[in-house]
């Protein structure tokens, strides 16, 4: 597994994978690809770094990470559907840890995303908070 720091030229590929991530986690985000590209560009222009995960010369996923004073915030982590169930998510995450030299990482996982919750717990993550939302009609 190789990990590559992304640049602006990677925004289309990152945004495409972000669209799949949104679908897979059944997020309430209804942004179109053009909107996701704009948002990804803003993330990279500001305080986030994105990394591509490469296995056998193929892009298999990505991560979007922000540095915090006490560690890192992993905003997005995605492994392509065609490459799942092969331990590539674990390998990619371990490469990311090495790349960042991270002691602490914070993630968010939607409560109905059972596959995501199971994956993160398998890596040793524990619940640290519960975020709640009120949406008035």
What are these regions, as identified by a protein language model?
Residues 1-16:
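A short beta-loop-alpha structural element at the N-terminal edge
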Residues 18-40:
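Conserved GNAT-fold acetyl-CoA-binding loop/helix
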Residues 41-52:
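A short helix-loop-beta-strand connector motif used in the catalytic cores of GNAT acetyltransferases and
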Residues 52, 58-66, 73, 78:
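Conserved beta-strand in the GNAT
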Residues 67-75, 84, 127-128:
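A conserved beta-turn-beta hairpin within the catalytic core of GNAT-like acetyltransferases
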Residues 83, 87-95:
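Conserved acetyl-CoA pyrophosphate-binding loop and the N-cap/start of the following alpha-helix
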Residues 106-117, 133-137:
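Conserved beta-strand-loop-alpha-helix junction that forms the acyl-donor binding cleft
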Residues 121-130:
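Conserved acetyl-CoA-binding loop of GNAT-fold acetyltransferases
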């Amino acid at each position: 597994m190789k990990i590559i720091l992304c640049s602006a030229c990677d925004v289309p590929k990152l945004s495409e994978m972000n669209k799949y991530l949104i679908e897979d986690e059944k997020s309430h985000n209804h942004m179109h690809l053009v909107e996701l590209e704009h948002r990804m560009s803003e993330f990279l222009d500001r305080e986030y770094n994105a990394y591509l995960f490469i296995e056998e010369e193929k892009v298999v996923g990505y991560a979007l990470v922000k540095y915090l004073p006490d560690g890192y915030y992993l905003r997005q982590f995605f492994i392509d559907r065609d490459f799942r169930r092969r331990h590539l998510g674990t390998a990619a995450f371990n490469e990311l840890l090495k790349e960042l030299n991270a002691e602490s990482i914070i993630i968010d996982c939607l409560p109905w995303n059972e596959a995501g919750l199971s994956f993160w717990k398998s890596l040793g993550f524990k619940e640290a908070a519960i975020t709640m939302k009120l949406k008035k009609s």
